[in-house]
Amino acid sequence: MANIKSSKKHISISEKRRKYNCSKRSMIKTFMKKVLFFIKEKNRIKAIKFFYIFQSLVDRYSLKKIIHINKASRYKSVLMNNIKKI
């Protein structure tokens, strides 16, 4: 454990940031599951609607470095290809 006051503050800040990032990653996964659910149900309109929301979230959080840019691109391309198959 850190003894210096600034180090203790940095640890608490890092913990807050980690919790924030985990919640945002969880939100991305939840929207991805919703899109996959509508793809499985063959509901193209709702799948596209949730895909656009998912796409904006992924783009926003990839720019903030919460997820990697290549991972964001991979998520979007996989989902869009699945939507096209409906």
UniProtKB/Swiss-Prot annotation:
Binds directly to 16S ribosomal RNA. This is Small ribosomal subunit protein bS20. Keywords: Ribonucleoprotein, Ribosomal protein, RNA-binding, rRNA-binding. It comes from the Bacteria. The lineage of its organism: Bacteria, Pseudomonadati, Pseudomonadota, Gammaproteobacteria, Enterobacterales. InterPro entries: Ribosomal_bS20, Ribosomal_bS20_sf. Belongs to the bacterial ribosomal protein bS20 family. It comes from Buchnera aphidicola subsp. Cinara cedri (strain Cc). Gene3D superfamilies: Ribosomal protein S20 (1.20.58.110). GO terms for biological process: translation. GO terms for molecular function: small ribosomal subunit rRNA binding; structural constituent of ribosome. It holds the Pfam family Ribosomal_S20p. GO terms for cellular component: cytosol; small ribosomal subunit.
